[in-house]
Amino acid sequence: MKKILIVDDEPNIVMSLEYTFKKKNFEVYIARDGSEALQIAKEKIPDLVLLDIMMPNVDGYETLKEIKNDKSLEHTKVVFLSAKNKATDIEKGLKLGADKYLTKPFSVKKLVAEINELLN
């Protein structure tokens, strides 16, 4: 069973994504901000982190940097899922090492397809 860590501070998005990925037989972990995400990631070693950018405490960019600097997480894929949809935001996310950058609002079907493609 693949492990996914959903990192977002919007409860409705978290609930929707959690439901979707559990239905698709993922083991799902939830974090509300970057610092909580890093704690969970180091403990659970997820196959993929679905990461928002604009969050309290530690933002998505900083969280991604920390994930990329952690040897135990070197095989973990990271997908940004953000409302920040300017070309400069997307470029920054990919330059920092995100495997994909998807924007909100999003199609659940497309999101699941993108994640399955990354993990298979």
Regions of interest found by a model, annotated:
Residues P11-Y29:
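Two-component/phosphorelay signaling modules centered on CheY-like receiver
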Residues F106-N116:
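C-terminal output helix
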Residues M55:
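Receiver (REC) domain active-site loop signature in two-component systems and cognate sites
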Residues I30-L48:
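Acidic, metal-coordinating helix/loop segments flanking the phosphotransfer/catalytic sites
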